[in-house]
């Protein structure tokens, strides 16, 4: 730690996005992250935009009120679409290494990333919990009102929207420098108590509690398959519930678990609380991959809707069939005119 102090002056003269520990361990620039981010976001943007736009259109227009998870699916799609719409600006920056817009727009895009992540976590958890609860308590499902889901969704947006504000606030240093954004934003130094409190809240509310809930739902749904079916509830209904809960769990663990495991170490490295060079290197090199995996939820969630709601599949099939028929008819009419 004594040697680490020698680099303090260098750190003060250097980039705000670089911590003292990074300079000490000679990991001042993870160069591959720019091409990784740009490539990932390019691959996600078009499919994510088309899939989530189509999903939102089908969910809002065609899915019946009988589908209890519809409200949570719509909100999940909105969260994904908000992040996807910000990807062109991220792609431009990571390719050009220059931010020509206002700093406020940069921080808004940065904020939308974390809003998407934690809103997605909450809505995936709600879908799993609701599906499991209605499977175990089918009579309660009959009395459940859609306005309850609307109220829960509104509360989630308010709480998550407020809770995500520290992310752009902590990165809003050096406001006069409008040329850098996203991965190159600086970090505000925090005292250890405030930092530990922020990490604890983020990990507990944004990861640990949802993991416990989703794991419990998966366990209870699996057990229900071994029990005799209740009135008006066949084995197929339980299998559909299990498939839904399993898919929510899969999206959650693939997209969000790596980030939250690395988040603790990465934040402590940036705040110069951890100075062990092996830990510094692992946290910094792993971080870009974690963020890319988190953005992958924008592609996986529409697949979730497809397998969760039979009406969703039916509407896509009907729309695809109608498009095919219209094309065939136009070709036939064109051929008859030529003939």
Curated annotation (Swiss-Prot):
GO MF annotations, alphabetized: G protein-coupled receptor activity
UniProt cross-references to InterPro entries, sorted A to Z: GPCR_Rhodpsn, GPCR_Rhodpsn_7TM
Extracellular side: 1-39, 90-103, 171-193, 266-288
Keywords: Cell membrane, Disulfide bond, G-protein coupled receptor, Glycoprotein, Membrane, Receptor, Transducer, Transmembrane, Transmembrane helix
Topological domain spans for side Cytoplasmic: 61-68, 125-149, 215-244, 310-339
Topology within the bilayer: Multi-pass membrane protein
CDD domains named among the record's database cross-references: 7tmA_P2Y10 (cd15153)
GO terms, biological process: G protein-coupled receptor signaling pathway
Subcellular location field: Cell membrane
GO cellular component, one term: plasma membrane
Principal location: membrane
TM region(s), chain numbering: 40-60, 69-89, 104-124, 150-170, 194-214, 245-265, 289-309
Bridged cysteine pairs (disulfide): 106-181
Domain of life: Eukaryota
Glycosylation sites: 16, 26, 178
Xref: SUPFAM superfamilies: Family A G protein-coupled receptor-like
PROSITE patterns: G_PROTEIN_RECEP_F1_2
Tissues of expression: Weakly expressed in blood leukocytes.
Protein function: Putative receptor for purines coupled to G-proteins.
Family: Belongs to the G-protein coupled receptor 1 family.
Entry protein name: Putative P2Y purinoceptor 10
């Amino acid at each position: 730690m004594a040697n680490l102090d020698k680099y303090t002056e260098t750190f003060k003269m250097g980039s705000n996005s670089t911590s003292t520990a990074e300079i000490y361990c000679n990991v001042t620039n993870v160069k591959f992250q720019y091409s990784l981010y740009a490539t990932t976001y390019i691959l996600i943007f078009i499919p994510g935009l088309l899939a989530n736009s189509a999903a939102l259109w089908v969910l809002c227009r065609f899915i019946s009120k009988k589908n209890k998870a519809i409200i949570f699916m719509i909100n999940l799609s909105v969260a994904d679409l908000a992040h996807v719409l910000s990807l062109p600006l991220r792609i431009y920056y990571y390719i050009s290494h220059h931010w020509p817009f206002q700093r406020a727009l940069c921080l808004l895009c940065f904020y939308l990333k974390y809003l998407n992540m934690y809103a997605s976590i909450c809505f995936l958890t709600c879908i799993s919990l609701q599906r499991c609860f209605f499977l175990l308590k089918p009579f309660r499902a009959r009395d459940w009102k859609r306005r309850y889901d609307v109220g829960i969704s509104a509360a989630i947006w308010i709480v998550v929207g407020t809770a995500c504000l520290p992310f752009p606030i902590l990165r809003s240093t050096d406001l006069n420098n409008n040329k850098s954004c996203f991965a190159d934003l600086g970090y505000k130094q925090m005292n250890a108590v405030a930092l530990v409190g922020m990490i604890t809240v983020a990990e507990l509310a944004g990861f640990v509690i949802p993991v416990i809930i989703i794991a419990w739902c998966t366990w209870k749904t699996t057990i229900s398959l071994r029990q005799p079916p209740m009135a008006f509830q066949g084995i197929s209904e339980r299998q559909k519930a299990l498939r839904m809960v399993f898919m929510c769990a899969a999206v959650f663990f693939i997209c969000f678990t790596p980030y939250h495991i690395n988040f603790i170490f990465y934040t402590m490295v940036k705040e110069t609380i951890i100075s062990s060079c092996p830990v510094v290197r692992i946290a910094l090199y792993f971080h870009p991959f974690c963020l890319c995996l988190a953005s992958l939820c924008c592609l996986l969630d529409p697949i979730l809707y497809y397998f969760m709601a039979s009406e969703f599949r039916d509407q896509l099939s009907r729309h695809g069939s109608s498009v095919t028929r219209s094309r065939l008819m136009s070709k036939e009419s064109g051929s008859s005119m030529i003939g």
